[in-house]
Amino acid sequence: MSVMKEFKEFAVKGNVVDMAVGIIIGGAFGAIVNNLVSQVILPPLGLLIGGVDFSSLYIILKEGATQAAPYNSLAEATAAGAVTLNYGVFLNSVFSFVIMAFAVFLLVKSINMLRRTEGSKSAVPAPSTTKECPYCLSSVPLKATRCPQCTSELK
């Protein structure tokens, strides 16, 4: 029974719950970014380049057994049993990764900026525990009546 109790304590800790929420939101954000890249960013980019659909870019490594090359589409090549290198799908993934990494960078940067402003507001200088000897300029404890360096009397 103690194992269940330990697991319950572990599972309801704030950090574990926060991490679970972060993973769920991150997965949803990843799906949004992938859709943004494949449906919004790459089609106009492909149009600018010359009417290229990135998701259908491929290289035939081996022709299919049922139909010889050329194939009109990736789906046709796959249906014919051709072995293909689908570099267009890889490019989609690279673009998604770059956008996701940039979004995470902006998030971390803004959090760090908030931490810096919070830290500067709460940073109150600690009261000094030393004073300076007026004769030799060495650091002396506040309660000292004589300087340990030059033995001068302090006021």
Curated annotation (Swiss-Prot):
Pfam families assigned: MscL
A GO-annotated cellular component: plasma membrane
Highest taxon of source: Bacteria
Molecular function GO labels: mechanosensitive monoatomic ion channel activity
Keyword terms: Cell inner membrane, Cell membrane, Ion channel, Ion transport, Membrane, Transmembrane, Transmembrane helix, Transport
Topology term for the membrane: Multi-pass membrane protein
Transmembrane segments annotated in the record for this chain: 16-36, 40-60, 88-108
Record bears the keyword Cytoplasm: no
Cellular localization per UniProt: Cell inner membrane
SUPFAM superfamilies: Gated mechanosensitive channel
Signal peptide: none
InterPro entries (UniProt xref): Mechanosensitive_channel_CS, MS_channel, MSC/AndL, MscL_channel
NCBIfam families: mscL, PRK00567.1-4
Quaternary assembly: Homopentamer.
Recorded family membership: Belongs to the MscL family.
Protein's UniProt name: Large-conductance mechanosensitive channel
